[in-house]
Every structure is written in C-alpha cells, then in structure tokens.
A protein has these predicted regions:
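Positively charged, low-complexity intrinsically disordered leader regions
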Residues: 3-16, 29-106
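Active-site nucleophile and cofactor-binding loops and adjacent substrate-binding regions
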Residues: 80-92, 109-119, 165, 208, ...
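A short, small-residue-rich loop immediately preceding and capping a beta-strand
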Residues: 85, 101-138, 226-240, 256-259, ...
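Short glycine/serine/threonine-rich phosphate/pyrophosphate-binding segments
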Residues: 87, 91-97, 111-129, 143-145, ...
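Active-site-proximal loop->helix
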Residues: 110, 118-176, 267-278, 384-393
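Glycine-rich ThDP/TPP pyrophosphate-binding loop and its adjacent helix/strand module
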Residues: 170-175, 179, 186, 195-254
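Active-site/ligand-binding loops adjacent to catalytic centers
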Residues: 173-177, 181-199, 250-253, 258-349, ...
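Claisen-condensing/thiolase-fold acyl-transfer catalytic domains that form or cleave C-C bonds
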Residues: 235, 239, 333-392
Length: 395
C-alpha cells in the first residue's frame, strides 16, 4: 500500500528533500540525525505531553457545531485549536522543537512569522524555558499584526522587521535563514510550518499530529468510531492541516479537503493559491509547488490572511494534491470573511482569518446527512478583528 508519509530520504513522492547552502549542511545533518531519536524517546514524550496538558491546555475540544451542521446538512465537528494557550495550533510545534533544541545544547532560538502566531508561540516557550529569542517578521505583517508584535516584545523576544521584497512571510523566512547561516553553532532555527528542508516538514507534522491523535479518541467517544468521513483544514505552509490529517493520511475511508488562499481570485494575480497555480520549484530548501513566473522567479503571493500568503506549500500537501489524495479548494478573501461572520453568528466563535478559509470550503462541498466532518479551527480571530471590520465597511 502506498504511504503518504515521508520516506527515508526526506521525500514525499517527488516533493521535499533538502536543497540548502553548504554552510548549513552541518546544522541540517545534525538535526536530521538527532530529531527522531529525541522525539521518539520516552523522556521527551513524557515532558512534551505534560506541557501540552498543563501549559497548553490540551486536549483541545472536539465540538459538535449544531447550527452549522444543520446549515450544511452533515454532522460537523470543530477541532478547537483556537482554545490552546496563545490562541492557535502553533504552540504544539514550538514546545516540541524548543525541547529538542535544549537537548541539542542550543542557546539561541530564531524564528520567522507571518501572522505573528508562530512568533508569539516561540517567544512564549522561550520565556518559559529561559532561551534567547529573535523573531523575523515582514514589515507589512508587523503593521497588520501590530498586537502580536507587541506581545512578542512583552515576552522578551527581539522582533526584527524585514524590509526586503513584499515584506511578508517569505522575506522573513529568507532573513531567518541568513541569520542561521551566520550563527550555525549556537542557534536553533524553529520553522513554524511543514516547509523548509528535510527534516522540518516531517518534524513539524509529527509534533502537530497530536491534533489527529486526539480527534481519533474524541470521535470514538462521541460517535463510536474513530474516523470521520471528511477532514477539512486551511493550508498555507500546512502545519495545522498536517496535524489534522496525520493519523488518517493513509486511511482511504477519510476524504481530505484543504483550503488554500484564493486572495482576490486565482485569475487576478492577487492570490496565494499554490496548488492551483504553482509549478515545481525549490523554495526555502524544499522541492514543491511554487507560484513563479516564466523565468522561474518566485512571484509575490497575496492573501488577506497573513498566515496563508506563502508562495510555496509544504511538500506533504503538494504530494497529496499530485496523487489526488486531497481535494484542494481556493477560497477567496470575501468567501473566507463571509464564512467567519457565519461561524460567529451561528456558533459564537470568532475564527482566525486562516481558519475562515477552511470554513469557506463548506459551501463548495456537498454532504450526506450521516457524514461526519471534522474541520480544524486553527486559531482564534482576535488578531484579525480590524481586518474583519474594515472589510465589512468597504462592502
């Protein structure tokens, strides 16, 4: 049977690998040789699970959204990652990677962030574990996610605004990689999504897989079976999606639906719909689909959501799309915002703009009344209130 998980060479089918400058070979090799041994050790698992339980507040609830279920004609459960400490799924990964960094003797943590959720989660865990923390954030994102920038500073992190390119996530990642090249010995680079060179996509997916591990147990309790008919998640780099599908990825009974950012529409050029528009390329050390021009130059992506405007996609998801294991839908800005308002009015939950893209997929799908659908609400909407309000005023 075909497996959709990573192979021993760090590939998902033809996607993945580690295409890195020579100066980083040693760092990446050290990580590749160490990560499985550490994260599979009993001592690590015990500390990781204890922090997820007592500090993050896991397991996160699996909530039957009755009014939304009625509207879409199925049994719709929401996996509430928005209820974690720091308000999103990102902290599952930062706790795991910083525990790993500590075991590797690293003293300085660097991170990139788009919406600021990964930055806040990294700064939070660095404060908890007394580590130096430097976060690179595009100047555009510093402005549109001002509160998260201030939170990171309050937590003791140094926030460096990046002024190259579009001044968003891709540019912040470039700067973080540059920093890592300059300080390979004492620095650990913590990537917030299933992107970058192997072993990052696999490591992040494994650390986030706590999401689907809990879904299995929670469905067994609520429905008497441990699998849904469909899983729905938004995808930028793809870490919440990877965590949502991890334990179901090879289970053909479970349909996988991924929602990427359509922006102002895939035909407008103002979009981040990598699966719809991307061609094979290399970005940040991985071979995957990339939005690029005829000359292979990476195009600037656009999405109203700071967490989804990435011109690549995690290799795990590129492979799922190429093998037709996942159905990938592009959800435009207005569709996402409409879906966010709908969830807020029907269930009293204000989702992050990223999660709103997953919710926006619901109206493009047809369900049977007995279908069990699990949709991951990857984060809460506090950081996006201004965007929601200003979009509404423009209408």
């Amino acid at each position: 049977m075909k497996s959709f998980l990573v192979d021993q060479d760090g590939y998902y089918g033809e996607f993945g690998g580690a295409y890195i400058p020579e100066i980083l070979h040693k760092c990446v090799e050290e990580l590749t040789n160490k990560y499985l041994e550490v994260i599979e050790s009993e001592e690590f698992k015990k500390e990781f699970e204890q922090l997820l339980r007592d500090y993050v507040g896991r397991p996160s609830p699996l909530y039957l959204a009755k009014r939304l279920s009625e509207k879409y004609g199925c049994k719709l459960y929401l996996k509430r990652e928005d209820l974690n400490h720091t308000g999103a799924h990102k902290i599952n990964n930062t706790i795991g990677q910083i525990l790993l960094a500590r075991r590797m003797g690293k003293k300085r943590i660097i991170a990139e962030t788009g919406a600021g959720q990964h930055g806040v989660a990294t700064a939070t865990v660095c404060a908890l574990m007394d580590m130096e923390c430097i976060v690179y954030m595009g100047k555009t994102d510093v402005e549109r996610q001002h509160i998260n920038g201030e939170k990171m500073k309050m937590l003791g992190a140094t926030v460096i605004p990046v002024t190259s390119g579009n001044m968003t996530l891709k540019d912040a990642t470039n700067e973080a990689i540059r920093d890592w090249c300059c300080h390979p010995a004492d620095t650990y680079y913590i990537i917030g999504s299933t992107v970058g060179p192997h072993p990052y996509p696999d490591m992040v997916a494994r650390l986030q897989s706590v999401i689907s591990e809990e879904i299995k147990k929670q469905l067994q309790e609520k429905e008497g079976r441990d699998y849904p008919d469909y899983l729905i998640a938004c995808v930028g780099g793809g870490s919440n999606a990877a965590g949502t599908i991890y334990h179901y990825i090879n289970d053909e009974r479970v349909g996988i639906i991924l929602a990427e950012a359509g922006g102002k529409g895939i035909e407008t050029g103002m979009t981040a719909a990598t699966i719809q528009l991307g061609k094979m390329g290399i970005i940040h050390g991985a071979r995957t689909y990339v939005i690029q021009n005829e000359d292979g130059q990476i195009e600037e992506p656009y999405s109203i959501s700071a967490g989804l405007d990435y011109p690549g996609i995690g290799p795990i998801h590129a492979n799922l799309a190429a093998q037709r294991r996942a159905n990938v839908l592009a959800i435009n800005d207005d569709e996402a915002i409409e879906a966010a308002y709908e969830l807020t009015k029907l269930e009293g939950i204000i989702p992050a703009l990223e999660s709103a893209h997953a919710l926006g997929a619901l109206r493009k799908l047809k369900f049977k009344p007995e279908d069990i659908v699990v949709l991951t609400v990857s984060g809460r909407g506090d950081k996006d209130i201004e965007t929601y309000l200003s979009f509404n005023e423009q209408q």
